[in-house]
Amino acid sequence: MAEEHKTERATPYKRRKVREEGNVAKSHEIASSLVVLLSLLLLLFLGTYIAKEVILIFLAVTGYVHADISELGSLYENFYENIVKVLTPLFFLALLVVILSHVAQFGFIFTLKPLSFKWERINPFEGIKRLISLTTLFETVKNTLKAFLLIGIAVFVLKGSLYFFLSSSTYPLAETLKSFIKTSAITLITLGVVALLIAFLDYAFKRWQYEKKIMMSRRELKEEYKQLEGHPEVKSRIKARMRELAKSRMMAEVPKATVVITNPTHIAIALKYNPEKDKAPVVVAKGKGTIAQKIVEIAENYSIPVVRKPELARALYPAVEVGKEISPKFYKAVAEIIAYVMFKKKKVYA
């Protein structure tokens, strides 16, 4: 049977499972491009400091050309110290950029599944398939085009300074070095910016490719639903959501109530009664604690009478359901309250 077409976007559950396996949309181009670009900017910013350290390294090496073998230890210490001073800022910058670029792409994730042993990784046939896959072909073509593009841009930027460098022997050494550093900086930063733009395009493509890869068929959606239907966590989440919706609907009915009976703050029952339509008062809302307080608050906002009847409230609460009529045994007590409420309304409007 032919594989069913995957036309549906991945569900949150599928995305979470795929993420746990270490499969996320990412582009290594972004990290490498940012490292190169920011390292260049750091070199420009700390150029004087780095140049001084490089000169010290050079002097340290040349100063010990004719040194005695007993002085080589001191040479090593000086050389190592200066190298560390030069490379430490670049190392920490590169580390920070790599971490932040990956966090920006797919957030924090820790999983050992990509490191787990899989037979297909050592299967030579699978290796050959990966080598001749469309993904490998795309990466090869992309990197080749990227290399040609960057070379073309470098040639274009350097072309303007070509004449100066060819005739540099006629200029002072300081001016030649200054021009060389300036031209190199402009060229490298331009290449870094272009490489970063290419990296963002690569990430957009990888994101599209990832979304396409994790798409689901209708059959997979049905199977996932059946699988999750009995999952305790999902069931509790669904029940909580249903309770929240029921509570919202119930609170929306409170403004339609005729009276609210309370105990006085622990229990609240909102009753609606229309003599022309209802055979008996209907419970539109009920609740304890904070829900009871909310019912009373809404009732007061809509000028609905709130009557304190602790014994009746305690008796009504377990015996009635929202949306149902009260039982006959409460008719007399509730009728007296509603009659009193209606009498007060008539007296107000009289």
Swiss-Prot record:
Primary site of residence: membrane
Annotated keywords: Bacterial flagellum biogenesis, Bacterial flagellum protein export, Cell inner membrane, Cell membrane, Membrane, Protein transport, Transmembrane, Transmembrane helix, Transport
GO cellular component, one term: plasma membrane
Keyword Transmembrane carried by entry: yes
Subcellular location: Cell inner membrane
Bilayer topology annotation: Multi-pass membrane protein
Pfam families: Bac_export_2 (PF01312)
Gene Ontology BP annotations: bacterial-type flagellum assembly; protein secretion
TM helices/strands, residue ranges: 30-50, 90-110, 147-167, 185-205
Family label: Belongs to the type III secretion exporter family.
Role description: Required for formation of the rod structure in the basal body of the flagellar apparatus. Together with FliI and FliH, may constitute the export apparatus of flagellin.
Official protein name in the record: Flagellar biosynthetic protein FlhB
Species annotation: Aquifex aeolicus (strain VF5)
